[in-house]
UniProtKB/Swiss-Prot annotation:
HAMAP family in the record: S_AdoMet_synth1
UniProt-annotated stretches for the region Flexible loop: 100-110
Example GO BP: one-carbon metabolic process
UniProt signal peptide: none
Name of this protein: S-adenosylmethionine synthase
Location relative to the cell: Cytoplasm
Gene name linked to the record: metK
Keyword Cytoplasm: yes
GO terms, molecular function: ATP binding; magnesium ion binding; methionine adenosyltransferase activity
SUPFAM superfamilies registered for this protein in UniProt: S-adenosylmethionine synthetase
Record: residues binding K(+): E44
Subunit-level organization: Homotetramer; dimer of dimers.
Main location: cytoplasm
Organism: Marinobacter nauticus (strain ATCC 700491 / DSM 11845 / VT8) (Marinobacter aquaeolei)
Length: 396
């Protein structure tokens, strides 16, 4: 993690078909959690020309107008006409949702809530680095910001000829573990057919790329590739089939940290694929914020139906102020990583998840949300509220 001289990460916009699918799945989850916080949800979505298929396993007392919900998400992203390539008003919505298996439920549900078992076996990772202000790797942070700016320029009318689908990629150069330059930038954006490539490239360079990336990291040899294949009129679900869970590296650390393989979107907090990955980020970020290390990666693993993690391991890549073994002892003392405890620690039983489904689950600022008369914190795993206690306990 600390040995690369050059590292590249990518991101995609909210209009990318895989991200559209993620947002639909998480919108379904949010709608259910609003009325039934203890629902079991595993919602998968596929989007393709003229159709959205929603499936999975859901056990809940809540009722959701699925068709209206799906159409609303599609239209919010501005897929509103066949000219753009996808129309939330006219596309077909197919519902193939079933209930959670009783075999899985018996492994999760317990008489004592704190004994709640993990919803599946698996391994999850959390990571943090002090190379950016949000304690995230720079390449993925810059990549997210580019496509966020693309959406902002499109929605505000600054660049009205932009369309929803876009991808970004940023290559950073490192010296002694610190970012010293950006060597390459790729930004491909869907657009209306009547804009010229010359106008598009000039506007995107000035109003998106230069507006977003730190000027001090751009240099005379930085490569810029804006719509390198030429026109990009056909996009979204017409150009590519979109599926929930296909952008797990975009969702996390851009490849800078390991990934256990489990996707996030459409899953309620009883699924440790999601909740334990969030807890891992929370732990790693507080360790770095406390100054215990410059970089930290934590792995946690579970067995289905078992509350206690089967393992907790940690690596600070030689940047720790104390030994990794001592940091693990602090983690065990300050963080309860049983599934039910994670849900309580991070207050996860709220409809906050659609907001996570584009532009990364990590490196986002926590903020207050109010839904259904209840106020809660979105992105609570980004808080650094345990850093002071960790620092005191470490004696540094």
């Amino acid at each position: 993690m600390s040995d690369y001289n050059i590292f590249t990460s990518e991101s995609v916009s909210e209009g990318h078909p895989d991200k559209l699918a993620d947002q639909i799945s998480d919108a379904v989850l949010d709608a259910i959690l609003t009325d039934d916080p203890h629902a079991r949800v595993a919602c998968e979505t596929m989007v393709k020309t003229g159709v959205a298929i929603v499936g999975g396993e859901i056990t809940t007392s809540a009722w959701v107008d699925l068709e209206d919900l799906v159409r609303g998400v599609i239209k919010d992203i501005d897929y509103t006409s066949s000219e753009v390539g996808y129309d939330g008003d006219t596309c077909g919505v197919i519902n193939i949702i079933g209930k959670q298996s009783v075999d899985i439920a018996q492994g999760v549900d317990r008489q004592k809530p704190e004994d709640q078992g993990a919803g599946d076996q698996g391994l999850m990772f959390g990571y943090a680095s002090n190379e950016t202000d949000v304690l995230m790797p720079a390449p993925i942070t810059f990549s997210h910001r580019l496509v966020q700016r693309q959406a902002e320029a499109r929605k505000s009318g600054l660049l009205p000829w932009l369309r929803p689908d876009a991808k970004s990629q940023v290559t950073c150069r490192y010296e002694n573990g610190k970012v010293v330059g950006i060597d390459a930038v790729v930004l491909s954006t869907q657009h209306d057919p009547d804009v010229t490539q010359a106008d598009l490239k000039e506007a995107v360079m000035e109003l998106i790329v230069k507006h977003t990336l730190p000027a001090e990291l751009l240099h005379k040899d930085t490569q810029f590739h804006i719509n390198p294949t030429g026109k990009f009129v056909i996009g979204g679900p017409v150009g590519d089939c979109g599926l929930t869970g296909r952008k797990i590296i975009v969702d996390t650390y851009g490849g800078m940290a390991r990934h256990g393989g489990g996707a996030f979107s459409g899953k309620d907090p009883s699924k440790v694929d999601r909740s334990a990955a969030y807890a891992g980020r929370y732990v790693a970020k507080n360790i770095v914020a406390a100054g215990l290390a410059e970089k930290c990666e934590i792995q946690v693993s579970y067995a289905i139906g078992v509350a206690q993690p089967t393992s907790i391991s940690l690596n600070t890549f030689g940047t720790g102020k104390i030994s990794d073994d001592k940091i693990i002892d602090l983690v065990r003392a300050h963080f309860d990583l049983r599934p039910y405890a994670i849900t309580n620690m991070l207050d996860l039983l709220h409809p906050m998840y659609r907001a996570t489904a584009a532009y990364g689950h990590f490196g986002r600022d926590p903020y207050e949300m109010t839904v259904g008369g209840k106020t809660f914190t979105a992105f609570p795993w980004e808080k650094t509220d345990r850093a002071a206690a960790l620092k005191d306990a470490a004696g540094i």
